[in-house]
Amino acid sequence: MARAKTVKRDSVTHIYQTCKQAGTCPPDVINKVEQTTVADNILKYGSAGVFFGGLGISTGRGTGGATGYVPLGEGPGVRVGGTPTVVRPSLVPETIGPVDILPIDTVNPVEPTASSVVPLTESTGADLLPGEVETIAEIHPVPEGPSVDTPVVTTSTGSSAVLEVAPEPIPPTRVRVSRTQYHNPSFQIITESTPAQGESSLADHVLVTSGSGGQRIGGDITDIIELEEIPSRYTFEIEEPTPPRRSSTPLPRNQSVGRRRGFSLTNRRLVQQVQVDNPLFLTQPSKLVRFAFDNPVFEEEVTNIFENDLDVFEEPPDRDFLDVRELGRPQYSTTPAGYVRVSRLGTRATIRTRSGAQIGSQVHFYRDLSSINTEDPIELQLLGQHSGDATIVHGPVESTFIDMDISENPLSESIEAYSHDLLLDETVEDFSGSQLVIGNRRSTNSYTVPRFETTRNGSYYTQDTKGYYVAYPESRNNAEIIYPTPDIPVVIIHPHDSTGDFYLHPSLHRRKRKRKYL
């Protein structure tokens, strides 16, 4: 009998890949591949509570961590009476890197006898503002020009000699001017010149004023030259008449139809004329033809077509729009009287033939609004920066100069130069026929306060905010009535009772009953 041949089992990874989708994997294959064996679970859950990272396990060093290995049963590596010894394997320590030795230098050594109290000094705060800007001016030497040989003249007369020395030639000088301008965004100036006297520039802000402009009395007479004012480019007006309006955005179809002879919206022979007084004709004319819902989004600026069934009669909201099938777009024009007219051309569907054709007349619905007037020219203002806003006033120019001789005094010849008669008022006031009016005549109101006979003095307050209220004091001699105020309760006494007994209230009497005696 032949022995069966042993077939080697396939690898666990290949078996897991083929049997995982079919779900026929053996349990040992699943546990090994997914690492769910007993050993894997011990390592997985045990590592959560115990940490062996500092012992150097599986690192190949075997140093036993920072404290080394300690023999079992001996406790820590400390012996009584001696120095503690640490058992380490004989391994060469690894060199991490060179150690840099930094020398420590004492800048200000402190002596032992010095005081330990550190004195405090006042220090100025940090200067946040920029300091003075240092300006350096470079002086370039003047280049030497061509040398000029000046002859030396010697004059000898007799025994003395005179030496004439010619002056040194002055070389030409060169001047260079540098300029720096800083931009300040918070400062705005006028970018164009002012039409009045004075001029404002962009860089230096130089104010230029003329030397004349005032009035001088008693001076020299000069010739007056007639000058012509030069208008500025901003001082002009445009006055154009408004062209007459005939219509607003007419359709080409209306223009072609209007060329036909005899056809017009106002032709009473071909088009029925209906004047509409309802204001809905301007905004929502469809509500005059049929009852419908209001749609605020829809603007009825187009032609409206209404499909009505002639078998079913519907009364329109407005009787003038009966049987209207089509209502055209609005047309704007002017009447001979100068009013604005809003017109709509409508078509009625009065008769319908057997073939389905609808026959009706054309109706011209219109409403006159107002007249068209020519607009007055409006003075427009320029946008942005422009000149003419600022006014520059120069004091000496606006003053008046009077030439007079101070040495002459016309009042010096008069004896009574400062007479008090000059202060008297010679006007005579006449009050004949005058009338004295107190208060304001336009707001004269009469108030009547009633008087009541009461035992108390009444106080009345009349509110008067328009005129004057005059109160006249009055004195009255009325006898004062004093009413008694008893402190004990009121007792009713009946003098006709002679029994001397008390008075019993009827409600306290005993009721009489009929009793039967046996």
From Swiss-Prot:
What is the protein name given in its UniProt record?
A: Minor capsid protein L2
The lineage is: Viruses, Monodnaviria, Shotokuvirae, Cossaviricota, Papovaviricetes
Q: Name one Pfam family in it.
A: Late_protein_L2
For this UniProt entry, the molecular function terms from Gene Ontology, in alphabetical order, are: DNA binding; structural molecule activity
Alphabetized, the UniProt keywords read: Capsid protein, Cytoplasmic inwards viral transport, Disulfide bond, DNA-binding, Host endosome, Host Golgi apparatus, Host nucleus, Host-virus interaction, Late protein, Microtubular inwards viral transport, Phosphoprotein, Viral penetration into host nucleus, Virion, Virus entry into host cell
Tell me yes or no: is GTP-binding among this UniProt entry's keywords: no
Residue ranges of the motif Nuclear localization signal = 1-10, 510-517
- Signal sequence segment: none
Report what the Swiss-Prot or TrEMBL entry states about this protein's PTMs. Highly phosphorylated.
* Subunit structure and binding partners: Interacts with major capsid protein L1. Interacts with E2; this interaction inhibits E2 transcriptional activity but not the DNA replication function E2. Interacts with host GADD45GIP1. Interacts with host HSPA8; this interaction is required for L2 nuclear translocation. Interacts with host importins KPNB2 and KPNB3. Forms a complex with importin alpha2-beta1 heterodimers via interaction with the importin alpha2 adapter. Interacts with host DYNLT1; this interaction is essential for virus intracellular transport during entry.
Q: What main location does UniProt list? A: virion
Q: What's a single GO BP term from this record?
A: microtubule-dependent intracellular transport of viral material towards nucleus
One of the record's GO cellular component terms: host cell endosome
Which gene name does the record give? L2
**Which residues pair up as cystines?**
19-25
From the Swiss-Prot or TrEMBL record, state where the protein is found.
Virion; Host nucleus; Host early endosome; Host Golgi apparatus
- What role does this protein play? Minor protein of the capsid that localizes along the inner surface of the virion, within the central cavities beneath the L1 pentamers. Plays a role in capsid stabilization through interaction with the major capsid protein L1. Once the virion enters the host cell, L2 escorts the genomic DNA into the nucleus by promoting escape from the endosomal compartments and traffic through the host Golgi network.
Q: InterPro entries, per this entry? A: Late_L2
Q: Return the annotated region ranges for Disordered.
A: 237-262
Q: Is Disulfide bond tagged as a keyword?
A: yes
Q: Which family does it belong to?
A: Belongs to the papillomaviridae L2 protein family.
